Amino acid sequence: MAEVANNEQQAPQFNIQRVYTKDVSFETPNSPAVFQKEWNPEVKLDLDTRSAKLADDVYEVVLSLTVTAQNGGDTAFLCEVQQAGIFSITGLTEPQLAHSLGAYCPNFLFPYARETVGSLVGRGTFPQLNLAPVNFDALFAQYVQQRQAAATAPAAEEANA
């Protein structure tokens, strides 16, 4: 019986406490002239994530999206959204926790951020903008590889000295 209780305590737990918009900005620096041009934009998306421990097993994850649309060499709009969530996460190893905070949570937050961006762009009276899905697992794996390479680079330099 005690063994069953221990197994239940060791089982990973993931709970979403809250999802919220932390910060929003929408700018149309070249309006109204931008509305007079033929619409053929170049859209750039920049992503960033960060996490902070709020309490034991409670974390805030913030997904930041910056969408810039250039049209005819001018900035048509600049949209910035910080979508955040508070998550309770227990029973994970450090690598599993890092993956959850760096990939799983941002993947959960992305649809909310995408909807906010789409809504702001529409309110700016621009054509609908649908952001493509993002593979946060691949981005996190790339981040881990870059950190590992950076950690081994100083050791290699010292060995060559």
UniProtKB/Swiss-Prot annotation:
Keywords: Chaperone, Cytoplasm, Protein transport, Translocation, Transport
InterPro entries per the UniProt record, alphabetical: SecB (IPR003708), SecB-like_sf (IPR035958)
Encoding gene (name): secB
Gene Ontology cellular-component terms listed: cytoplasm
Source organism (scientific name): Shewanella baltica (strain OS155 / ATCC BAA-1091)
Signal peptide: none
Function: One of the proteins required for the normal export of preproteins out of the cell cytoplasm. It is a molecular chaperone that binds to a subset of precursor proteins, maintaining them in a translocation-competent state. It also specifically binds to its receptor SecA.
A Pfam family the protein falls into: SecB
HAMAP family for this protein: SecB
GO MF annotations in UniProt: unfolded protein binding
Protein name: Protein-export protein SecB
Stated family: Belongs to the SecB family.
Complex formation: Homotetramer, a dimer of dimers. One homotetramer interacts with 1 SecA dimer.
Compartmental location: Cytoplasm
GO biological process: protein folding; protein tetramerization; protein transport
NCBIfam families with a match to the protein in the record: PRK05751.1-4, secB
